[in-house]
A protein has these predicted regions:
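Short N-terminal mixed-charge amphipathic segments
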Residues: 26-52
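Short, internal acidic amphipathic alpha-helical interface segments
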Residues: 46-89
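Ampiphathic alpha-helical segments that act as solvent-exposed interaction surfaces
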Residues: 62-71, 92-125
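Short, highly charged C-terminal tails/helix-capping segments
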Residues: 120-146
Length: 146
């Protein structure tokens, strides 16, 4: 998609992405990854962190996500998708967005995802590793970001 390519290039991220398809790109941030795409008239950045909410610890987990949302101050927020995935995401209208703004949005999602995935795994997923996104991806080559 030309608009996304142009934004990534002007934001200095073009050499750090792996194209998933015409509408989606992936970037790696430490142990987390961010999927970026244009959906309709919006640009979204999503870091899929967990396949499911931790069994037996739901109330404490939800509280922790809300606390993390408050800490991030609106830069990004946790959500639970209809398929059960726990994601960290941010988005805004495409109109008027420039590459630097996109890079800032992606970096916010990436850095917070990299910070919080390890904390949440340690607190909630040590006995449920199958619910994390920490699978063997040795066959996938994804450029590192700062």
């Amino acid at each position: 998609m030309a608009a996304l390519d142009d934004l990534m290039a002007s934001g200095g991220l073009a050499d750090k992405v792996v194209r998933i398809d015409d509408n989606l790109m992936r970037l790696q941030w430490g142990s987390a990854f961010v999927i970026v795409g244009i959906s309709g008239s919006a640009v979204v950045a999503i870091a899929p962190l967990f396949r499911a909410v931790p069994r037996g610890r739901e109330p404490a987990f939800y509280r922790r996500l809300l606390e993390h949302n408050a800490y991030m101050g609106g830069i990004a927020s946790f959500a639970i998708q209809s398929d059960g995935w726990v994601v960290l995401h941010a988005g805004r209208p495409l109109k008027g967005m420039d590459g630097q703004e996109l890079a800032t949005m992606i970096a916010g999602v990436g850095r917070f995802a990299d910070q919080f995935d390890d904390q949440l795994i340690a607190e909630f997923y040590m006995d449920q590793p199958e619910a994390t996104n920490q699978t063997d991806a040795s066959h996938v080559s994804v450029p590192e970001t700062d």
